[in-house]
Amino acid sequence: MQEQYRPEEIESKVQLHWDEKRTFEVTEDESKEKYYCLSMLPYPSGRLHMGHVRNYTIGDVIARYQRMLGKNVLQPIGWDAFGLPAEGAAVKNNTAPAPWTYDNIAYMKNQLKMLGFGYDWSRELATCTPEYYRWEQKFFTELYKKGLVYKKTSAVNWCPNDQTVLANEQVIDGCCWRCDTKVERKEIPQWFIKITAYADELLNDLDKLDHWPDTVKTMQRNWIGRSEGVEITFNVNDYDNTLTVYTTRPDTFMGCTYLAVAAGHPLAQKAAENNPELAAFIDECRNTKVAEAEMATMEKKGVDTGFKAVHPLTGEEIPVWAANFVLMEYGTGAVMAVPGHDQRDYEFASKYGLNIKPVILAADGSEPDLSQQALTEKGVLFNSGEFNGLDHEAAFNAIADKLTAMGVGERKVNYRLRDWGVSRQRYWGAPIPMVTLEDGTVMPTPDDQLPVILPEDVVMDGITSPIKADPEWAKTTVNGMPALRETDTFDTFMESSWYYARYTCPQYKEGMLDSEAANYWLPVDIYIGGIEHAIMHLLYFRFFHKLMRDAGMVNSDEPAKQLLCQGMVLADAFYYVGENGERNWVSPVDAIVERDEKGRIVKAKDAAGHELVYTGMSKMSKSKNNGIDPQVMVERYGADTVRLFMMFASPADMTLEWQESGVEGANRFLKRVWKLVYEHTAKGDVAALNVDALTENQKALRRDVHKTIAKVTDDIGRRQTFNTAIAAIMELMNKLAKAPTDGEQDRALMQEALLAVVRMLNPFTPHICFTLWQELKGEGDIDNAPWPVADEKAMVEDSTLVVVQVNGKVRAKITVPVDATEEQVRERAGQEHLVAKYLDGVTVRKVIYVPGKLLNLVVG
């Protein structure tokens, strides 16, 4: 073997071998335990970033480890290829989204191969191909026939610049997350899937997900937002209809002093006919976005509608206000306000001088002080007529029962979760397979017209979707009658909700899934991706699995047994202030830094001499220009070094700070491993290891080897603390580097140790390990080698450390054979100078001996 470690030479050779041998291609095999390891599929943006590299390295380490345990391991990859960025890039580069996307896929595929990930490339899929989305379209038509799909007019966040609907989460500070244009409210007809029909199951089955992070489960619970309460009907004077509100706190009902309705509510619209102030307010609300996260913090505003509702229990008239914190699409579009016991209602009432009536006593039994804030804790009722003295639960039931008996109340279970709006007014997505006939009938596209293919050879003007701009595209014939196709496309969360299942049978032509293959591989054993997907993707992913189960395609309730959310990758961020006061972000690669004695950055400038402001470590991003190109790092250090650093620098679920000094350290370590194997193999063949003939020192070294195997196995397999596994291998390497290599058994022991080290490192650094395994004459390819097993006998300690005390004070620590008797330990202790000194001329009155640990001599 060559003396120097040259990753640029070995890595491409090993990758070619994997390609030619199709090492990672798998098929169903009932005789083997399966393991399905999946990382979230990437969007083909054009280049991999370090976040991708971290995600896929974690997945590859787990997949290779499980393979070495003898399991049938599936690790597929594909491309989440539809979406808005392709449209923007196409306009910018004067091309169409399809060629831009396919070019990116080809480029990024090479980048993934360059990093040595062990994917089954025969299963690669791209969600923008008709071969993929045809089954999604077919499934949608089946859901429609089952009554799980409907169309309704809905208020949306509309970006006038991108001409598209935005999800609440895509509205930041009232503006579009992508182009920063002010968002408007707009009513348009859209398609919905009834995820609410599965709300209870989605909620209850979270309890089955023992190996999902609690944070993700809590976020989903809150998002589904199940609550039990009462729906109450109010009569409104001089108004033709009643108002219905929902409350989870009927115990506070006697403190209700006003009602609030959404600006879009029919009552507000009617009142605005003669109220210019209210009309202007409604207009303002129409153009304000309603992302829930912002609802809590935005300024609460309202206008009195002039209508008065009648409190069903007290008969009092209470005002009805239009307020910006009430949403038409949540519940009934109206809420009851109890300012004494709800902080939002309190702030609104204080601002507009509305009545605040306390009805719950403070914890000490006194009347609450409402001069500064509402009392939101539960407690005993007062000021509530016949309900005085009741605690929360009793009052909840008594008031609910009375309202029900009067015919103005009904107990209800409510959900925050809304049905999933899947319509997007974009071009680059899967066409929604619905048609409208000449007579106005709306129906699913017939099976013989599926897939509805998206034309790829289009011209983008950056404003109108090409399939909306071309009236011919929508024309079709159904049942002999002219019809128009739907020109909206699916939300791209549709494609990413079922791809994991299609990986089990990507070539299957008879339907969406081959149930036999799907049920062999599913559920996914470990799913790896960022926590930012906790509520949207991961909820739709679970929902789709249940839909496919109910369609008879899969036989499990949940799509993934374990979820691992990797931490973000951070890097140093620098900027200088430009002439107009703007911040110009400078890549950390271009920053020349000075550090103090503790290694902290104290000064920085760029090549042009600008003084740079250092803002610390922050998430790698385009906006701060602090991304590090993985390709540059691989070309500089090799893929194995980058992978090793990624897994060593931080626990997988914590943030990782990118430090090139750490990358250099990982590279030095691999050079040391190479050097040790080189020096060992240069001495020629090795004799067989005779464990019975080992010296004490050799036994001690072998004990270290097998203890390391045991620790690394536990760290990777059970604990998934990959960084501590690598640290243990490094520690063992330090010992091996100092071990004698002269004797026959020294070399035999070194051979055993190096074969173990190379196999333990293999999941992390597969190229160097593939090569070193061959140099060490390991059996076959390392890709088919079994994981090393710790020898229990080798780990047994021959000797143990005993603490010797005289009258409870430590006087010595002695090493004795594990099987030494108490007499032998006392005799050995007596040979210690300090112990002998304290025993001289005194009588030992009592001996306390804890075998193998402690000897305490009580003297007097």
UniProtKB/Swiss-Prot annotation:
Its EC number is 6.1.1.4. Keywords: Aminoacyl-tRNA synthetase, ATP-binding, Cytoplasm, Ligase, Nucleotide-binding, Protein biosynthesis. It comes from the Bacteria. A motif ('HIGH' region) lies at residues 42-52. A motif ('KMSKS' region) lies at residues 619-623. GO terms for molecular function: aminoacyl-tRNA deacylase activity; ATP binding; leucine-tRNA ligase activity. It is an enzyme of class 6 (ligase). InterPro entries: aa-tRNA-synth_I_CS, aa-tRNA-synth_Ia, Leu-tRNA-ligase, Leu_tRNA-synth_edit, M/V/L/I-tRNA-synth_anticd-bd, Methionyl/Leucyl_tRNA_Synth, Rossmann-like_a/b/a_fold, tRNAsynth_Ia_anticodon-bd. GO terms for cellular component: cytosol. ATP binds at K622. PROSITE patterns: AA_TRNA_LIGASE_I. Signal peptide: none annotated. GO terms for biological process: leucyl-tRNA aminoacylation. Its main location: cytoplasm. It catalyses: tRNA(Leu) + L-leucine + ATP = L-leucyl-tRNA(Leu) + AMP + diphosphate. It is found in: Cytoplasm. CDD domains: Anticodon_Ia_Leu_BEm, LeuRS_core. Belongs to the class-I aminoacyl-tRNA synthetase family. PANTHER family: LEUCINE--TRNA LIGASE, MITOCHONDRIAL, LEUCYL-TRNA SYNTHETASE. Monomer. This is Leucine--tRNA ligase.
